[in-house]
């Protein structure tokens, strides 16, 4: 169980680093891949900006929202490299959540990866609006033998 949790957290951390490093405000189309960037900044109550809630607490996420569709997946990256949040969904309707990386929250790197038996996630799609909810897992380095589970909710619109 500990190995699966470690693999899930490491995979989520790599996903966040990789996707947030690709954030730009360019929109390209070619070879079956589509990238869309929405230059939005989140503010409390902003309907068009990304909304991220972890463990019942609204996260102040700022930066671009980048959505890339390739090989049957939708890759969503929110924010910059330091505060990046990422998700990979299938492009179906409803989409299936493959992974979510929430970054470091109060000293705990949180993530979800399907098939690991750790946490859970589901998603809905309404046009270009996505809502992803679930429970992410992580390891608190102050107590590494006790896994941490936190609920999360992500709402984002790809333009």
Curated annotation (Swiss-Prot):
Residues of the signal sequence?
A: 1-21
Post-translational modification remark: Modified by Lgt on Cys-22 with an S-linked diacylglycerol with a mixture of C16, C18 and C19 fatty acids, signal peptide is removed by LspA, modifed by Lnt with an amide-linked mixture of C16 and C19 fatty acids.
Compositionally biased residues, Low complexity? 27-49
Q: Pfam families of this UniProt entry?
A: Myco_19_kDa
- Where the protein is mainly located, per its record? membrane
* Record keywords: Cell membrane, Lipoprotein, Membrane, Palmitate, Signal, Transport, Virulence
N-palmitoyl cysteine lipid modification positions: 22
Mode of membrane association: Lipid-anchor
Which residue ranges does the record annotate as region Disordered? 24-51
The record lists the membrane-crossing segments as none
Q: Which GO terms describe its cellular component?
A: plasma membrane
InterPro entries found in the cross-reference section: LpqH (IPR008691)
Q: Which residues are the lipid attachment points (S-diacylglycerol cysteine)?
A: 22
Q: Where in the cell is it found?
A: Cell membrane
| UniProt note: domains | Forms a U-shaped beta-half-barrel with a large hydrophobic cavity.
State the family named in the UniProt similarity comment for this chain.
Answer: Belongs to the mycobacterial 19 kDa antigen family.
Its biological purpose is as follows:
Might be involved in ligand transport. A host TLR2 agonist, modifies host gene expression in response to pathogen.
Protein known as? Lipoprotein LpqH
The source organism is Mycobacterium tuberculosis (strain CDC 1551 / Oshkosh)
């Amino acid at each position: 169980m500990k190995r699966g949790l470690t693999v899930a957290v490491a995979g989520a951390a790599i996903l966040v680093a990789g996707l947030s490093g690709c954030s730009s405000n360019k929109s390209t189309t070619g070879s079956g891949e589509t990238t869309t960037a929405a230059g939005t900044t989140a503010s409390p109550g902003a309907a068009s900006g990304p909304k991220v809630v972890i463990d019942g607490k609204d996260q102040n996420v700022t930066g671009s929202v980048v959505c890339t569709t390739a090989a049957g997946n939708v890759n969503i990256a929110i924010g910059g490299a330091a505060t990046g949040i990422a998700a990979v969904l299938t492009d179906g309707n409803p989409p299936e959540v493959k992974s979510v990386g929430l970054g470091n929250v109060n000293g705990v790197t949180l993530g979800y990866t399907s098939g690991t038996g750790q946490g859970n996630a589901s998603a809905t799609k309404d046009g270009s609006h996505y809502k992803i909810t679930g429970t992410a897992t992580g390891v608190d380095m102050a107590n590494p033998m006790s896994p941490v589970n936190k609920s999360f909710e992500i709402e984002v619109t790809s333009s």
